[in-house]
Amino acid sequence: MGGFNGTPFTRLQTWWRHMPEFTAWLTKCEELLEEGVPSNDVLWYLGDAVGHKPDEYYAFPEGYAVDYLNHDVLTNRLTVKNGLFTIPEGASWKVLWVPDEHFMLPATRKRLAELAKSGGKVVFGGKDALVKALLTVGKDVSTVPALGDGLNEDFMWLHRKVGVMDRYFVVAGTSGWSGKVSFRVNGAAAVYDPVSGERYAWRNGDVLELHPSQSVFVEFGGETASKRRNQKREVACKFAPWRLSFPKGWGAPENVTLDALRSWTEISGFTAEAKAYSGTAVYETEFDFGGVADGARCVLDLGRVESIAKVYLNGKEVRTLWCEPYSCDVTKFVKKGKNVLKVEVTNTWRNRVVYDLNQPEKDRKTWILYQKNFNPPLDSPLIPAGILGPVKLFGIGKE
């Protein structure tokens, strides 16, 4: 469980043993985002007043990105070179924006005047003044459908310059993203998925499809990549019945057979305590596989999963899936004929905590510090848990 101020990474979390998959993703993203320097168009001067916290939800013009500038850097480190504002580390900006300020030090006014005389574009005033200045710059990122100004959670991005390469970190919102995207860069592009490790060629201005909350890197001028395989064909396989097993001591039956997948909270015959199970349960089933076309890859798609799935096929570990899409390449593991699929699924502590809150304190198996701040309300409904599916197998071939 977590609270308003974060999530505790401790060994008592249900998902603790799966953390290497998540932290590996964090490590890869941080590694790539630390390379190079920011490549944004606008420097936003925060002003000279004390406590000048920027408005992170300010309706900044869509298609541009901003870095913040304080008085120390303005005075001691910022210079103008070839019409661009630069710092010793190598980052540069095209516009220095100074919003309407009620208070400004004489030294600040003097320094801004010096930078303007050196050829830098210094813009005073509100958003309208900034927009007029940016018309001569051109958008760094354009999308179809177009996004509104301000912090837009449908499609967010960061731009960094790594040597001769332009690297964009793109993040979709909770609804996902499917639309055309144009970056202000020429040349061949490659999309890199830090979760799966997949890397494929992409053409600037084409449609970019992202699952809910998915993030990818789009790189121009870096390593070349092969074209993505888009020909997707479902392979006829019957994934049923399922044998579902739970550990002892938490109110759930040790074994149950399911003809169809459903949330643990909706399994007929389960007690209230069983429906509220939190932890890891194991799914097992067998299916017959007839093969796919030569050269095609096989991808197993578990559909909806709540919340983490560790996949085994024919006794071999395939991969841990902790975010959408809950799918993995099983080309090296699947075989013609009978196959044995095992999936270990882990949910969060939430359902058990909700159940325990409605029990006498002596009967509870979970407890939380700072109960007032962290506990869900007594009447909170249980959230879905387990594999909800549908589970499918696909053959992925070249176009």
Task: Locate predicted features.
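Aromatic-lined ligand-binding clefts that engage carbohydrates, nucleic acids, or primary amines
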Residues: 287-314, 341-345
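Carbohydrate-binding surfaces of carbohydrate-active enzymes
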Residues: 1-280, 288-292, 330, 392-395, ...
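Beta-strand/loop-rich accessory regions of lumenal/periplasmic or secreted enzymes
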Residues: 263-269, 273, 304, 321, ...
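Short, surface-exposed tryptophan/glycine-enriched loops
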Residues: 288, 328-340, 344-349, 354, ...
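A beta-strand/beta-hairpin structural motif
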Residues: 322-326
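Glycine/proline-rich low-complexity spacer/linker segments in large multi-domain proteins
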Residues: 223-244, 347-393
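Short, hydrophobic/aromatic-enriched beta-strand segments in well-ordered soluble domains
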Residues: 216-222, 285, 341-347
